[in-house]
């Protein structure tokens, strides 16, 4: 399964709490080895998180990786397919709807 992982800092803390959380998330990240194949990590320019593009046959491994960072980051996993596959699926859906 291909996926895009979106991560953002958890909201709600004071400035000092947010700074401590940011520091800890960077420490954890420096010691972490992904359980899934990560093709690309990118950070948002505004410092409010980022995205990872990856692939796995084990969704439970991805869940474990997200759980490691859950005290510091909100993670949203978007399963994705190649755009050509998406276009083929949409074309089949249009054909189905036009026939029925």
Predicted regions and their residues:
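Short S/T/G/P-rich N-terminal loop/turn motif that feeds into the first structured element of a domain
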Residues: 1-48, 82-100
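Short hydrophobic/aromatic beta-strand micro-patches
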Residues: 8, 53-55
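An amphipathic, aromatic/His-enriched active-site/gating alpha helix that lines ligand/cofactor pockets
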Residues: 30-31, 35-36, 55-88
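A short pocket-lining beta-strand/turn micro-motif at the edge of beta-sheets
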Residues: 49-50, 73
């Amino acid at each position: 399964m291909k996926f895009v992982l979106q991560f953002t800092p958890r909201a709600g803390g004071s400035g000092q709490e947010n700074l401590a959380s940011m520091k800890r998330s960077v420490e954890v990240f420096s010691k972490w080895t992904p359980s899934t194949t990560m093709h690309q990590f990118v950070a948002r320019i505004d410092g409010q998180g980022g995205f990872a593009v990856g692939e796995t046959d084990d969704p439970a491994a991805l869940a474990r990786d997200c759980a490691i960072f859950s005290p510091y980051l909100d993670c949203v996993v978007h399963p994705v397919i190649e755009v050509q596959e998406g276009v083929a699926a949409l074309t089949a859906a249009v054909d189905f709807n036009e026939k029925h």
